């Protein structure tokens, strides 16, 4: 029998949790972070489920594990873990991870105020603002984002037939905008969105193929982004992003905001240099910006950036003990 210990720094980004594993993570094989991600999923996924699910976590829990970079142009590598699996990229997770890693001295940037992250989705460039010991703001320049498909038809429980656009911003998102059978996220409860989203996701994945043209391992739709009119006076739009099995992102969602900007840019509603302020279901804001035009395997794309803040909430030494019948976690349907 064995007891495995994990030293974690807990915090949140604009309201959504981030658990940074600062000690206890496994050594992983692979020459890239995508290969290391595959090794983790094949051999160590019990760490993810044990730390993310109940009784040590909860339905909204997400986190990260730090590793030495696999490429010379990066300061540190990050593996993202959450209840839904190991995401190739996580925007709110990046902002929280960078904030806590800098404040706790877990990462020493080569250039103060700047950091390059090695993620499974690719290089993510970071700029951060620090006041004394505290990081007040983080801006990440994400991987290229693009509109993948428009007007995909799918049957949604209770609502009936709806159409969605699918965009990539580090993960694939189905974007639900106002239409005949859907008005605004505010017209439905969070419980309704949580009930409909996994069915919608399953039906879309069964009916359509979602394949990143350059990254073979990114081959399914993972998130649903429900849109709405903003309530905050600075915001351009509001969203409720569904992920995992029953979670609504409390932050505006970084990769979701990237996907949304890519969708709007593809339709001529955003251009390089434009800002896009995205509001979450709890009213927190991410400040997005279209940095420049790009291309992914011949497909028009943008390079988006996202700025937000995070706060540390405490330290946590977590045991995963083989004697515990719930060592690897559980989720109640």
From Swiss-Prot:
Signal peptide coordinates: none
Active-site annotation: 90 (proton acceptor), 253 (proton donor)
Any GO molecular function: 4-hydroxyproline epimerase activity
Pfam families on file: Pro_racemase
Subunit structure: Homodimer.
Protein family membership: Belongs to the proline racemase family.
Name used for this protein in its record: 4-hydroxyproline epimerase
Species name: Brucella suis (strain ATCC 23445 / NCTC 10510)
């Amino acid at each position: 029998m064995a007891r495995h210990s994990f030293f974690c720094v807990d915090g949140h980004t604009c309201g959504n949790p981030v658990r940074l594993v600062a000690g206890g993570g496994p050594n992983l094989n692979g020459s890239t972070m995508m290969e290391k991600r595959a090794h983790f999923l094949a051999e160590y996924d019990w760490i993810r489920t044990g730390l993310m699910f109940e009784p040590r976590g909860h339905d909204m829990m997400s986190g990260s594990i730090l590793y030495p970079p696999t490429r010379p142009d990066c300061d540190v590598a990050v593996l993202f873990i959450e209840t839904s699996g190991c995401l190739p990229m996580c925007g709110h997770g990046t902002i929280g991870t960078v904030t806590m890693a800098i404040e706790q001295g877990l990462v020493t940037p080569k250039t103060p105020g700047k950091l390059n992250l090695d993620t499974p989705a690719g290089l993510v460039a970071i700029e951060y603002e620090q006041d004394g010991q505290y990081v007040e703001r983080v801006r990440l320049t994400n991987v290229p984002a693009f509109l993948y498909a428009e007007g995909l038809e799918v049957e949604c429980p209770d609502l009936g037939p709806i159409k969605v656009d699918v965009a990539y911003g580090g993960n694939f998102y189905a974007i639900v905008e106002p239409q005949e059978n859907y008005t605004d996220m505010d017209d439905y409860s969070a419980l309704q969105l949580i009930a409909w989203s996994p069915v919608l996701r399953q039906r879309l994945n069964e009916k359509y193929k979602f394949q990143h043209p350059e990254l073979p391992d990114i081959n399914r739709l993972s998130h649903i982004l429900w849109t709405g009119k903003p309530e905050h006076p600075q915001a351009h739009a509001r969203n409720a992003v569904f992920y995992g099995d029953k979670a609504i992102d409390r932050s505006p969602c970084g990769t979701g905001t990237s996907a949304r900007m890519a969708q709007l840019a593809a339709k001529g509603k955003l251009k390089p240099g434009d800002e896009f302020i995205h509001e979450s279901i709890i009213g927190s804001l991410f400040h997005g910006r279209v940095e420049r035009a790009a291309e992914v395997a011949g497909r028009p794309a943008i390079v988006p950036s996202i700025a937000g803040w995070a706060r540390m909430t405490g330290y946590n030494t977590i045991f995963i003990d083989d004697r515990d019948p719930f060592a690897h976690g559980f989720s109640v349907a």
